[in-house]
Amino acid sequence: MRMLVLYEFGLSPFAQKVKIALREKNIPFDRRNGLTGEHAAEVRRLSRRGEIPLLLGGTTVVTDSTIILDYLDEKWPDPPLLPDDPARRAESRSLEEWCDSEIEATLYNLGEIMFSEDGPAEARQAVMEFGQAELTRHQAALADRLGDDDFFDGSMLGRADMSVLPHMNASRVMRMAPAQENLLAWLDRMNARPSVAEVKQSLDEFKALMAEVRAGSARRQMRDHRLDWLLRAGGAAILEARMGADNIRFSVA
């Protein structure tokens, strides 16, 4: 079988959870930046939505991080990413969906406010306050969900942990780290794993992307859940400013 190729972007939480899974399973792969640069066109050709991460194995193309993890677990089942118990498996999948939608949208939009200057100041302030309150709520709920367990799937490292980790690392980098001791201890345990140490990113990559956006050489994607969150947060004027500047996209076109 040909070497797997992962089209990704280092700061994408969706790509990060896939990379952790690949490394925990000891599956070799090549990485390509699929968001900007020469490989972005390949992603648009291979994926109807032009989204990363995208996993390519010979003629097999797998898109969407959740589906990629399903594929990896079916093709390389050891070690498994989900518990054996059906109820725990359902809980793990629900947590992954929560991370991929609500929590991702919160941190994505907070990052946009912190490192761009789109829209009027009052709208930006409203979104920042809404986002900080949402993040605090999510962190408290995650701490309750973790409890005294070592991992979110109990005694085993699984896809729930891989889904939560990128967001909690991002909150720490953005100086909005969780206050709960059990969640912080879990974060330290996870970051000590070799599979995680290799995917941690600094803000430099995000700042470089924002510089490309300002220069007009890159456009950010407003996925549906991010757009819904921004409008609920009172950011309609910010969206209008971005559309006027033509620095976002809603689809491949």
Regions picked out by a protein language model, each given a short descriptive name:
Residues F29, F115, N182, V196, ...:
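Juxtamembrane helix-loop transition sites at the ends of transmembrane segments
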Residues C99-P194, S202, I248-A253:
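GST-like fold's C-terminal all-alpha helical module
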Residues L81, A197-V199:
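Acidic/polar loop patches that form or flank catalytic/metal-binding clefts of enzymes
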Residues A208-A241:
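Long, charge-rich low-complexity segments
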Residues S202-L203, L227:
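Exported/periplasmic ABC-transporter solute-binding proteins
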Residues H39, K207-A208:
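Generic structural signal for helix capping and beta-alpha/helix-loop junctions
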Residues M1-A133, D228-A253:
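GST-like domain detector, emphasizing the conserved glutathione-binding G-site
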Residues R44, A90-R93, S163, L184, ...:
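Generic structural signal for individual residues within well-ordered alpha-helical segments
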